[in-house]
Amino acid sequence: MCTKESKMNYKFDGSKVYFTSDTHFYHSNIIGFCKRLFKNVEDMNETLIENWNQVVSQDDIVFHLGDFCMGGSHEWTKILNRLNGKIYLVLGNHDLKNIRQGYASRFELTSMQMHIEVDKQKIYLNHCPLLCYGGAYGNTWQLFGHVH
């Protein structure tokens, strides 16, 4: 369950919460760039979807920390229709070019950054790591993607 505390503060209680980033669905160049051991983009997409759904149930919460998918609405919708969970997307550099209003609504929330609390632990979410972030000098964790 999610209760909105302020504009970008959310508190989650009672659900399984997962964090991931940089899936790069439909990004064929990422296979070579990051030395992903897949034959092609279809093999990569199918493996990522299968692994995701083996762990995440429909009621679980997933924070995706950016670079979700390449392509247009057909590709994004095709992937989103197959993934379990309630997905919150922190926009990554590739998402900024590819996110469209038509399927942005398929996410629980899309934002450049999020402040959340899980089991009384404050967590700051962003796609890129930041040296100075809200809570950097307190007991707030920072989770990020981007650096592969």
Language-model features, listed with the residues they occupy:
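A short acidic-Thr-Gly-centered motif at the start of a beta-strand
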Residues: 7-12, 132-136
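Core catalytic region of metal-dependent phosphoesterases/phosphodiesterases
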Residues: 9-20, 25-115
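Conserved beta-sheet core of the metallophosphoesterase superfamily
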Residues: 104-148
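Short, Lys/Arg-enriched N-terminal segments with co-localized hydrophobic residues
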Residues: 1-7
